[in-house]
């Protein structure tokens, strides 16, 4: 018996010892020394400043201990994960198989040193600020199956060497700056199951080699610039479950082979053309079907309502007609807005569901007692008109008791009061949290209609407002702490308005992309803005317009109200990033809205009441003196007011809400226009520095009494400047029209003019980054004048003295005294020449032909002066060089183009940016106007978004040397600067452009409504 017990004891001892040894081996397994050293190199390339590998083995902690910089902002979305296989060398050695460093704002490059982790299977580096491209060295990693580098600053072409990544099953490069065509070699990655190329700058047609990718299950190629039709070979991807093509650039029709894909769960296609008939989709398991703004016509096929798994159906902004009925189990989200659907929707059963349903902009009929559901959007859904066109009978009061002339809304926020020099303005609250995917909320004189859900965020509880706790700068920061947003379409409409002309101000600030998280700067929110059904802003990007996040930008437009309603629509056309700072962040966003009748100068200002006690005047003689004095005062005041009212009528005629300063205010601000405060001479007269009582520093332009311009030109300048708000235009605060004085009040620019910064005796030391920023800023300002403002405008005198610099060296264009409205129907205006020799385009100076291309020429000269630090008005280079531009052309031919770069930079400049700026300057100063780019194209060239067209030298009569010489002759021998041109204005009609708008937010349904109403009323 004892032998048996002893045997059992020995057996259990051996088993226990074995288990202890295994545990000991596992506990002492550690990362291979080579890979430990490799991590240090990888961290350096990624831009990690300090990496702690001493305290704990990475495979044990399953993370990298990174010591962040001081300004690092903690982020709950950070994913810092290391995956290891510790089965090597009898479970004592670990090898890294997975590396995830996501949402960390790393600023380095993709590390080729990852090849020193030979067992690596997965690379995840999303949401950083990494630059460069995908290293071809990674192809050596035999086990690599997944590359995810979304939301970075990677650029260039996708490398053709991708074919060497033979085992790759997932490639995700969404949200970068990749450009060029997709390489044919991508079709060799036949193991791919996931391919995400969205939100880049890819161009060209999709190569036919992609037909080989038969294992693909999900594809995202949205928000690119592809060309051609949707390829039929997508039908080869028989395992495909998710296909997202919105705003890709591809056009219809949808090939039959694609329609027959049976495993499709999600099909998203939007904002394109060529898809006229509804596809007969084979997949019965569809969960998401988006065919938005693609040109569909005819009725909605009945099989759609029988797809039991369908959760999201978006058929908005097409030409679908017919009746919607027989719907038993509708999808959770249905968007039918902007079609021609008709019938009595109340009898169809659709409204009895719990779905979110958008019926806006259709031709449905409603009873007078129609019920408004909290999840049903009925705005503009009926052809039954009432006194407020387009709203269902139950949606508005029978009659407007009072007509309003102004409205202020704090979008997404509480009631806010702001103060300006005239008094207090109150912005109404818009903080209702009842907004949903298909809602129409209505208040006393306005309403807001919302369409769409953020499908990418995988959440059933979307929020349609946002806010920030950060301290904001700029004027009236309280207006920008909140904002309302939408996933597709956001409409603000005002009703019971007095008819007439209105000034509409739209306030924007990007508060969802924070500069504190570096990767968030890469976010691009792009949407379109329509006012009264007309496209006002296409591809509007708040960040780009404001030159950064958390900066305000105001867009103004003049609109006409004829039916007591005004409508503002913001629409997402599928462009921009959708995954920064996280999935589901896209679509329009707006902070505040203000609209004011042109004959309402106070625009809702609440006047402060002053109570004045008048002393009792005793005695008849005292009363008589008082009466006489009053009579004289009234007479004098009448003369003054008559003159002042005339000027104010001129201002009102232009629909302005300019702040009027008193003479006493400006006299006090400038210390009685003390010469010590004189800044210089402007286009009309002297300019003085001043300080208002609230501490605001201003620049006051005192118009010369000898100026030939006078009141009309004064009003003209106010008319053009006051309606323009842009970060790169000098802001006009207001004016003064007292005591026969005409004064303009501008923001004060601390660093004076660009001319002084470049050529002055005490010139600023502008480094290359400042010069690049200044040049791009000028370009953006001109782009706005030409194409971004409500009225297109030619400046006519762009030069370095008319570019001012603020404290942060932001460039702002000044002196619009020479500007002329550029009517959209005129190709050129021949008028008196007014400008500066050395900056004027040849066709303008010699023949008086004025187009935007004259400003483009002047900008090219200024750009060359910025890069060179030299003035174009002085001879440069050798004796054969007539001008700075001519010298640059000579250097380009000899291959010494960088010799023109300012030596003050001492070689410290970005060579590629310098070459780009020089080439842009040269193409802008082409002697032929037709060969110059537009300012919009020039901006994209400067930012590297498009190629720079080759400069064509012209030895003929328009040649640069001949033109400059002739201009100097004119400057010497002519004082009138008219070049023999009369001041008669001659016009030539502009040729029409392609008529089809891809984003018809007023589709035929709305046009037909208007036509029917107008025709019936004329009978």
UniProtKB/Swiss-Prot annotation:
GO terms for molecular function: ATP binding; protein serine kinase activity; protein serine/threonine kinase activity. Residues 673-946 form the Protein kinase domain. The keyword ATP-binding applies. The modification Phosphothreonine is found at residues 831, 836. Pfam families: LRR_1, Malectin, PK_Tyr_Ser-Thr. InterPro entries: Kinase-like_dom_sf, Leu-rich_rpt, LRR_dom_sf, LRR_Rcpt-Like_S/T_Kinase, Malectin_dom, Prot_kinase_dom, Protein_kinase_ATP_BS, Ser-Thr/Tyr_kinase_cat_dom. This is Probable LRR receptor-like serine/threonine-protein kinase At1g29720. It comes from Arabidopsis thaliana (Mouse-ear cress). The gene is RFK1.
């Amino acid at each position: 018996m004892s032998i048996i017990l002893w045997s059992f004891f020995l057996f259990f001892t051996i088993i226990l010892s074995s288990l202890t040894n295994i545990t000991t081996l596992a506990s002492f397994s550690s990362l291979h020394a080579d890979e430990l050293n490799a991590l240090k190199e990888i961290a350096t390339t990624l831009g990690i400043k300090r990496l702690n590998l001493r305290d704990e083995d990475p495979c044990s902690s399953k993370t990298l201990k990174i010591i962040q910089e001081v300004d690092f902002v903690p982020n709950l979305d950070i994913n810092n994960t290391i995956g290891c296989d510790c089965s090597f060398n009898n479970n004592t050695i670990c090898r890294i198989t997975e590396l995830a460093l996501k949402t960390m704002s790393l600023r380095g490059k993709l590390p080729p040193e990852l090849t020193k982790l030979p067992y690596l299977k997965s690379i995840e580096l999303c949401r950083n600020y990494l630059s460069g491209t995908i290293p071809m060295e990674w192809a050596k990693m035999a086990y690599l199956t997944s590359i995810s580098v979304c939301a970075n600053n990677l650029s260039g072409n996708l490398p053709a060497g991708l074919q060497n990544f033979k085992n790759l099953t997932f490639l995700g490069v969404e949200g970068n700056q990749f450009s060029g065509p997709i390489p044919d070699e991508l079709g060799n990655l036949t193991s791919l199951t996931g391919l995400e190329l969205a939100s880049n700058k890819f161009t060209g047609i999709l190569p036919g080699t992609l037909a080989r990718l038969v294992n693909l299950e999900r594809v995202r190629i949205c928000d690119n610039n592809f060309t051609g039709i949707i390829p039929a070979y997508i039908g080869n991807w028989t395992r495909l479950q998710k296909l997202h093509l919105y705003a890709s650039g591809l056009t219809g029709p949808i090939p039959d082979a694609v329609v027959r894909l049976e495993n499709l769960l999600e099909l998203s296609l939007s904002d394109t053309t060529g898809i006229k008939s509804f596809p007969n989709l084979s997949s019965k398991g569809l969960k998401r079907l988006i065919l938005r703004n693609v040109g569909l016509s005819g009725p909605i096929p009945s099989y759609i309502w029988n797809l039991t798994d369908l959760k999201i159906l978006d058929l908005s902004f097409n030409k679908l007609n017919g009746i919607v009925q027989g719907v038993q189990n509708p999808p959770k989200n249905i968007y039918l807005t902007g079609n021609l659907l008709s019938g009595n929707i109340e009898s169809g059963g659709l409204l009895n569901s719990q779905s979110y349903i958008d019926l806006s902009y259709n031709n449905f009929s409603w009873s007078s007692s129609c019920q408004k559901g909290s999840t049903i959007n009925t705005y503009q859904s009926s052809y039954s008109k009432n006194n407020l066109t387009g709203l269902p009978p139950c949606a508005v009061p029978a009659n407007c008791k009072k007509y309003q002339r102004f409205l202020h809304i704090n979008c997404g926020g509480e009631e806010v009061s702001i103060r300006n020099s005239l008094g207090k303005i109150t912005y109404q609250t818009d903080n209702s949290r009842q907004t949903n995917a298909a809602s129409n909320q209505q208040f006393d004189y306005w309403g807001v209609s919302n369409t769409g859900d953020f499908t990418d965020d995988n959440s059933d509880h979307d929020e349609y407002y946002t806010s920030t706790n950060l301290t904001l700068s700029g004027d009236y920061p309280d207006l920008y702490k909140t904002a309302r947003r939408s996933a597709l379409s956001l409409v603000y409409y005002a009703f019971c308005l007095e008819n007439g002309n209105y000034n509409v101000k739209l306030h924007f600030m990007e508060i969802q992309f924070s500069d504190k998280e570096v990767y968030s700067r890469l976010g691009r929110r792009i949407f379109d803005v329509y006012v009264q059904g007309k496209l006002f802003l296409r591809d509007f990007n708040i960040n780009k317009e404001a030159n950064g996040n958390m900066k305000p930008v105001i867009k103004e437009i003049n609109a006409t109200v004829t039916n007591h309603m005004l409508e503002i629509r913001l629409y997402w056309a599928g462009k921009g990033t959708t995954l920064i700072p996280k999935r589901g962040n896209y679509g329009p966003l707006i902070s505040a809205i203000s609209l004011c009748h042109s004959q309402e100068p106070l625009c809702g200002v609440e006047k402060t009441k002053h109570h004045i006690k008048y002393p009792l005047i005793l005695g008849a003689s005292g009363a008589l003196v008082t009466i006489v004095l009053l009579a004289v005062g009234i007479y004098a005041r009448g003369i003054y007011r008559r003159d002042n009212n005339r000027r104010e009528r001129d201002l009102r005629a232009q629909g302005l809400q300019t702040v009027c300063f008193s003479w006493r205010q400006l006299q006090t601000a400038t210390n009685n226009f003390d010469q010590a405060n004189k800044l210089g001479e402007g286009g009309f007269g002297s300019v003085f520095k001043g300080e208002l009582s609230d501490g605001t520093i201003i620049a006051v332009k005192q118009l010369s009494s000898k100026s030939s311009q006078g009141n009309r030109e004064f009003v003209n300048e106010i008319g053009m400047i006051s309606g323009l708000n842009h970060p790169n235009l000098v802001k006009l605060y207001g004016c003064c029209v007292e005591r026969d004085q005409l004064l303009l009040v501008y923001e004060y620019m601390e660093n004076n003019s660009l001319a002084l910064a470049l050529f002055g005796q005490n010139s600023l030391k502008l480094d290359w980054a400042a010069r690049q920023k200044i040049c791009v800023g000028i370009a953006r300002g001109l782009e706005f004048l030409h194409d971004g403002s409500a009225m297109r405008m030619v400046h006519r005198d762009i030069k370095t003295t008319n570019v001012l610099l603020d404290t942060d060296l932001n460039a702002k264009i000044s002196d619009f005294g020479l500007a002329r409205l550029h009517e959209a129907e005129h190709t050129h205006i021949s008028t008196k020449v007014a400008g500066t020799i050395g900056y004027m385009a040849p066709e303008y100076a010699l023949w008086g032909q004025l187009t935007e291309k004259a400003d483009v020429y002047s900008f090219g000269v200024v750009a060359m002066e910025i890069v060179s630090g030299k003035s174009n008005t002085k001879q440069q280079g050798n004796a054969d060089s007539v001008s700075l531009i001519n010298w640059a052309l000579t250097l380009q031919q000899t291959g010494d183009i960088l010799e023109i770069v300012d030596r003050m930079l001492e070689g410290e400049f970005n060579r590629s940016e310098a070459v780009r700026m020089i080439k842009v300057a040269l193409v802008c100063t082409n002697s032929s106007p037709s060969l110059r780019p537009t300012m919009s194209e020039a901006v994209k060239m400067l930012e590297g978004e498009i190629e720079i067209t080759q400069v064509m030298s012209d030895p003929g009569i328009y040649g640069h040397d001949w033109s400059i010489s002739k201009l100097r002759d004119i400057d010497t021998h002519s004082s009138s600067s008219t070049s023999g041109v009369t001041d008669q204005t001659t016009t030539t009609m502009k040729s029409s452009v392609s008529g089809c708008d891809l984003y018809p937010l007023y589709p035929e349904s709305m046009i037909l409504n208007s036509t029917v109403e107008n025709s019936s009323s004329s009978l």
